[in-house]
């Protein structure tokens, strides 16, 4: 999957990834340059075909994540790692390999699918930090997108505490967005439930399963001693114009960050994929051509017209910034947690320092 994505990548990219959500949408009204968006629909088609024939061993993959047991992995990988460490004179701590890049990430929704209303589902996402949740052997671990374990705690997820972890097979792996304000892990997707992997299942089935099983776990949505963080499933909606208008006029129990558009047939594939699209709510009208109701979600922020210029300027010093952050992290044990999208500006729109990578 990764090789195919790289082979099909076009020249547009302010970051290293094609249509990365770390950069602004190429079709913001103030910047209607003709970027290469035709490939996005073609890459969607090819990825859907590829996943029909490509069946990875996700049973063992999920087990390794749950048990942190990598026995049997290629010995050459370890030798390569050892050689790299011997050649590396930089004392900065390397990123962990095992739990990094395990989440399925989106691209900006540039090329609007012709079957958007029939074959796509939209999820309203809260402001927060993406987290890989692994509940296994009586403990629950939270990992960043980069693979750092930032918290371990008990939870009422299957396998997440000593009381309900009856067997080693009772493990759960979730894709979540953590809201520090609400002390809540909003469940975006499910990769494994009670030892049963769902990587090869279609999005509509994964969402159905997730929203059916989460309410069955009594107390999971409450903050208690044994469950110090709430786990709440995010709802999904059809992508018809009528549904989108209704969604954008709703009130949500969290601050809304943006919208994720999932193709119904998408399997859960770690890494960026054009089969998951990302838009900020105020972009729906311009990008999708849908008449939206006036309201807080659809009001364009002041920085919308300056976002592209800010990102470009910010990227010039990105490598230096990353080196400083990594060095600082290795010294004090704190690591940069990556946002789902561009955080709100805390300074005037013309300041390039106010934007961070997602």
From Swiss-Prot:
According to the record, the residues making up region (Necessary for interaction with XPO1) are 1-160
- Positions of region (Disordered): 1-39, 69-89, 315-358
The name this protein carries in UniProt is Snurportin-1
Q: What is the lineage of its organism?
A: Eukaryota, Metazoa, Chordata, Craniata, Vertebrata
Output the PROSITE patterns linked to this UniProt entry: IBB
- Point out the gene that encodes the protein: Snupn
Please give the Gene Ontology molecular function terms for this protein.
Answer: nuclear import signal receptor activity; RNA cap binding
* Source organism, top-level taxon: Eukaryota
> InterPro entries, per this entry?
Importin-a_IBB, Snurportin-1, Snurportin-1_N, Snurportin1_C
Similarity section? Belongs to the snurportin family.
Which organism does this record belong to?
A: Rattus norvegicus
